[in-house]
């Protein structure tokens, strides 16, 4: 099988699908777990009003919570994976809905935890630690809760907010169902008149084509279709930011951004400093755009020209087997213990590889490491898909290490560090590929791909982050997120980030309609900060070898045992300063010079 043929789910060869029996042997076993989980709310209720009574009671509560968290994580993971493998399957959509409803019910049942732990006097808590040494395992979780005391409400209010959690998922669910299951696009033709099937999954690969006619036709057809439903897309985004504002206001935060970042202990200035630092380096992006126009030899550079490789015909078809082999070679620098787990993941079907009809687009790794994470791909047998593979396996290895070496309550790393391991893998792969070739054409192609990573990860994700910040401010001021308002703001940002050399086609004003991460609550900025951190970490690994790898494994195994900025500081990267972003973009400038010299 290859990435060109899109089959119904039932016809995809088993070896290219994930084996969810590692979580539950069958759907029936999952349903048995559904019934078993219904017993927990009563057990949890027995602790209400009692967490401050004794050290033993508090320890017993945390032990029960760990048990529930592991079981619910596996329960939701199974249903979500089943749903995402074919979002048009109503049975698994129902299973997913039941999973989230159950998780919300259990979260609501334990909603008294935060306020009760907040109410324990400092001297009483100190006595608890002395009386019950096992509570030390939970000190970090307790400290995180008590740090947010000003934003925790009464038990009654916390229960209401917890119950509202399922409603808050509606914008994302609506977008996902509409965009992935219901949207259909017209076929498009290339320069030879051959017909191509346009889907959300084939859209970007078409924009990478050397056939400019195909690129333009796909670009215009995709956004024409999106434009027909622009008000639906705007409505879901409006609902998303209204619910973020509701929760931010309820918890007495100054903004939706502050509310989002406070949970993960990331200072707001890290977000705004990123935008400022990238603004200060836009000249390098403009140089890149000018170089791309020159090399492509076009009179006008359009938005449908930004994905196609600059070096014509340098890309080669890379099968999934080849991609796995190269990934193992590139990541061997991280040690045999690291690659042994990768090989286990490949051989034991932790991955769902190819696109099928109705499958969720894009790629992701599940955040649950019990028994192990799963990875969804839509592999296309090209270089970009190989980078996606190592990216998602970076997530998988981060999750695997944290769940293996951390107790349950500190195993889940926060999103601020979530993209570091994945991006570090990409950079190690790029360095590996560049180190294998002296061919000027191939080297130029790889450097251009590296430059595109800077463009797509550091610049583009910062542009998304700035757009997300603007949407948050609109919602906070009471302004509706209408199609016209969103498109005007997005087009203005596109012009700012790409500069005057790029033609910002009218269609690109609707790109916000296709970005699922806008429903992830200020997530995308971390791609940019993580890329900057990953550049520094990969350089250290390649420069120092074993000592750096040892520190890196500690980072991977750190979960949320420390504040995320501190975990990175232990690797020598201080994201509270603009230095990592500026250093990464200095490398971007150097790569532009090298590519220019190679291509003359």
Question: What residues fall within each predicted segment?
Answer:
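Short pre-active-site segment immediately N-terminal to the catalytic Zn-binding motif
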Residues: 316-318, 368-390
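Long, K/E/R/D-enriched contiguous segments that form extended
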Residues: 295-339, 398, 445, 451-457, ...
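Conserved helix-loop functional segments at active or binding sites
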Residues: 329, 333-340, 366, 395, ...
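A well-structured
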Residues: 1-313, 598-600
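Post-HExxH zinc-binding segment in Zn-dependent metallohydrolases
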Residues: 413-442, 450-452, 456, 530
């Amino acid at each position: 099988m290859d990435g060109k043929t899109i089959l119904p789910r039932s016809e995809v060869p088993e070896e290219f699908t994930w084996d969810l029996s590692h979580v539950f042997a069958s759907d029936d076993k999952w349903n048995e777990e559904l019934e078993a989980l219904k017993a927990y709310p009563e057990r949890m209720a027995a602790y209400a009003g009692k967490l401050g009574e004794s050290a033993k009671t508090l320890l017993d509560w945390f032990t029960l919570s760990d048990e529930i968290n592991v079981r619910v994580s596996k329960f939701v993971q199974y249903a979500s994976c089943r749903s995402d493998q074919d979002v048009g399957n109503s049975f698994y959509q129902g299973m997913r809905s039941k999973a989230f409803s159950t998780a919300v019910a259990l979260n609501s049942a334990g909603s008294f935890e935060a306020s009760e732990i907040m109410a324990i006097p400092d001297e009483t808590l100190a006595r608890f630690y002395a009386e019950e040494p096992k509570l030390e395992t939970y000190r970090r979780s307790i400290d995180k809760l008590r740090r947010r005391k000003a934003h925790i409400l009464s038990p009654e209010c916390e229960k209401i907010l917890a119950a509202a959690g399922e409603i808050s998922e509606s914008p994302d669910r609506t977008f996902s169902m509409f965009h992935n299951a219901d949207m259909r696009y017209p076929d498009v033709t290339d320069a030879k008149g051959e017909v191509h099937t346009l889907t959300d999954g084939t859209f970007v690969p078409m924009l990478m084509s050397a056939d400019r006619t195909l690129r333009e036709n796909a670009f215009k057809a995709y956004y024409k279709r999106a434009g027909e439903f622009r008000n639906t897309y705007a409505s879901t985004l409006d609902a998303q930011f209204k619910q973020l504002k509701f929760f931010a206001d309820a918890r007495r935060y100054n903004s939706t951004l502050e509310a989002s970042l406070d949970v993960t202990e990331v200072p707001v200035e890290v977000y705004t400093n990123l935008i400022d630092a990238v603004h200060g380096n836009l000249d390098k992006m403009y140089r890149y755009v000018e170089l791309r126009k020159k090399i492509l030899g076009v009179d006008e550079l359009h938005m449908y020209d930004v994905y196609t490789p600059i070096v014509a015909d340098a890309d080669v078809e890379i099968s999934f087997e080849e991609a796995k082999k190269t990934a193992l070679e590139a990541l061997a620098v991280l040690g045999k213990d690291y690659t042994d787990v990768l090989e286990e993941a490949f051989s034991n079907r932790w991955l769902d590889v190819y696109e099928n009809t109705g499958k969720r687009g894009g790629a992701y790794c599940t955040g649950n490491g019990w028994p192990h994470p799963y990875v969804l791909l839509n592999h296309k047998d090209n270089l970009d898909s190989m980078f996606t593979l190592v990216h998602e396996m970076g997530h998988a290895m981060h999750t695997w290490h944290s769940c293996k070496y951390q107790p349950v309550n500190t195993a889940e790393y926060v999103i601020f560090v979530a993209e570091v391991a994945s991006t570090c893998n990409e950079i190690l792969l790029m360095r590996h590929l560049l180190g294998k070739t002296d061919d000027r054409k191939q080297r130029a192609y790889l450097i251009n791909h590296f430059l595109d990573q800077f463009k797509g990860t550091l610049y583009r994700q910062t542009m998304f982050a700035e757009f997300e910040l603007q949407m948050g401010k609109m919602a906070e001021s009471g302004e509706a997120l209408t199609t016209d308002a969103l498109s005007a703001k997005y087009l203005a940002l596109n012009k700012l980030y790409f500069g005057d050399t790029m033609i910002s086609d009218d269609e690109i004003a609707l790109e916000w309609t296709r970005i699922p991460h806008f429903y992830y609550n200020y997530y995308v900025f971390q791609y940019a900060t993580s890329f900057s951190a990953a550049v520094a970490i990969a350089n250290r690994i390649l420069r120092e070898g074993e000592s750096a790898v040892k520190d890196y494994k500690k980072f991977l195994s750190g979960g949320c045992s420390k504040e995320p900025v501190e975990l990175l500081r232990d690797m020598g990267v201080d994201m509270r300063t603009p230095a990592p972003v500026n250093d990464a973009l200095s490398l971007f400038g150097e790569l532009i010079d090298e590519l220019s010299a190679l291509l003359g």
